[in-house]
Swiss-Prot record:
Family the UniProt entry places it in: Belongs to the alanine racemase family.
GO molecular function: alanine racemase activity; pyridoxal phosphate binding
Single GO BP term: D-alanine biosynthetic process
Signal peptide as annotated in the record: none
Protein's UniProt name: Alanine racemase
Pathway annotation: Amino-acid biosynthesis; D-alanine biosynthesis; D-alanine from L-alanine: step 1/1
Modified residues (N6-(pyridoxal phosphate)lysine): K46
GO cellular component: cytosol
Named cofactor requirement(s): pyridoxal 5'-phosphate
Gene name for this UniProt entry: alr
Keyword field: Isomerase, Pyridoxal phosphate
Database matches in CDD domains: PLPDE_III_AR
Reaction it catalyzes: L-alanine = D-alanine
């Protein structure tokens, strides 16, 4: 690394940083494995590991016992396979979000497990396998009630299973898995949970009766891994829980499951100044100071993933006290009213973290923005350096 690059990176960290605690991630993976002792674990690292950094988090998860990695796009999966130093050869990597004309041949040659939900995808992956001269690893996805990706039950599923059997006989592919995804596993007692489990059992049983012999059957996402033992089957694939965030306040806090949030988002105050009462703050003057006060400028904005919907409501810890965003969050910055306190420029402002030092959590920001904690951590942008600790 050149001196100029090192200085630029150091300056960026001084402005703002997302600290990623890899020891917490490893502990979370171990806690999740204990929740599903009879199943293998797929660490879902899609969307740059929910904003935490895919390759460092993948390595940490594998070190803690994950034997599979999951991504949405094939590009994410190919990047994992190409990482240097490489992941262990026996770690399986699956990707599931395909569009026509995707990099099927590259995926086959990289030994990825690819999801197939429709006949067009079956035709493309078998064509890629024929061209590569290598059997594809295919997982058939069933729509058991989510109404999103996956093959519909009935005639569509029967055709897809039949096509997979014929391709296996030709040596073009191996069906390594049958899988699905829950719609409402984060809502305890929702009737769709039992209905989807029943449908999943029916659809996998049909495929196996026809002659498919998958290595794994899986449907358990984070909430199902944590609360639904009947859904664990051969493999669980937690995503958000691996990063120490609860899938939903309704099922419990991270601490209830022995999980610890992995990301801490902090910045250094760029400016601290005194203003009189009645002073408008930020665009539109949606906040006016109630009296003489101190304002602190936090150099993070919606370009960095701070949700504009949290204007006038997002919590921030400064000098040991919770403060609230004053007025609108702008593209690169927002303001907090510090009352009578006068911290020095450069003082730390913590937006969220585990919460055990008094700081807000990602869930607090989700409540302030009217969204879910998944979005809070995942949307933190590339302008914010990731700083890995406890590697």
């Amino acid at each position: 690394m050149s001196e100029t690059t090192a200085r630029r990176d150091a300056d960026a960290v001084l402005r703002a940083r997302a600290e990623i605690d890899l020891a917490a991630l490893r502990a979370n993976v171990r806690a999740l494995r204990e929740r599903a002792p009879g199943a293998a674990l797929m660490a879902v690292v899609k969307a740059d590991a929910y904003g935490h950094g895919a390759i460092p988090c993948a390595r940490a998860a594998v070190a803690a016992g994950a034997t599979w990695l999951g991504t949405a796009t094939p590009q994410e999966a190919l990047a994992l396979r190409a990482a240097e130093p490489g992941l262990p050869d026996d770690v399986r990597i699956m990707c599931w979000l395909w569009t026509p004309g995707g990099p099927w041949r590259e995926a086959v040659e990289a030994r990825l497990d690819v999801s197939v939900s429709a006949m067009w995808a079956m035709e493309e992956v078998t064509g890629a396998a024929r061209a590569a001269g290598v059997p594809a690893r295919v997982q058939l996805k069933a729509d058991t009630g989510l109404g999103r990706g996956g093959c519909q039950p009935g005639a569509d599923w029967e055709r897809l299973v039949g096509a997979a059997l014929r391709a296996e006989e030709e040596g073009l592919l191996r069906v390594t898995g049958l899988w699905s995804h829950f719609a409402c596993a984060d809502e305890p007692g929702h009737p769709s949970i039992a209905a989807q489990l029943t449908r999943f059992r029916e659809m996998t049983a049909y495929a196996e009766q026809r002659g498919l012999r998958p290595e794994v059957r899986h449907i358990a996402n984070s909430p199902a891994t944590l609360t639904l033992p009947d859904a664990h089957f051969d493999l669980v694939r937690p995503g958000i829980a691996m990063y120490g965030v609860s899938p939903s306040p309704e099922i419990g806090t991270p601490a209830d499951f022995g999980l610890r949030p992995v990301m801490t988002l902090a910045a250094s105050l760029a400016l601290v100044k005194q203003v009189p009462g009645g002073h408008g703050v930020s665009y539109g003057h949606h906040y006016t100071t109630p009296g003489e006060t101190t304002l602190g400028l936090v150099p993070l904005g919606y370009a960095d993933g701070i949700p504009r919907h949290a204007s006038s409501s997002g919590p921030v810890l400064v000098d040991g006290k919770w403060r609230t965003v004053a007025g609108r969050i702008a593209m690169d910055q927002f303001v907090v009213d510090l009352g009578g306190d006068r911290p020095e420029p450069g003082a730390e402002a913590v937006l969220f973290g585990p919460g055990d030092r008094g700081e807000p959590t990602a869930e607090d920001w989700a409540q302030a923005a009217g969204t879910i904690a998944y979005e809070i951590v995942t949307r933190i942008g590339s302008r914010v350096p990731r700083v890995y600790v406890n590697e």
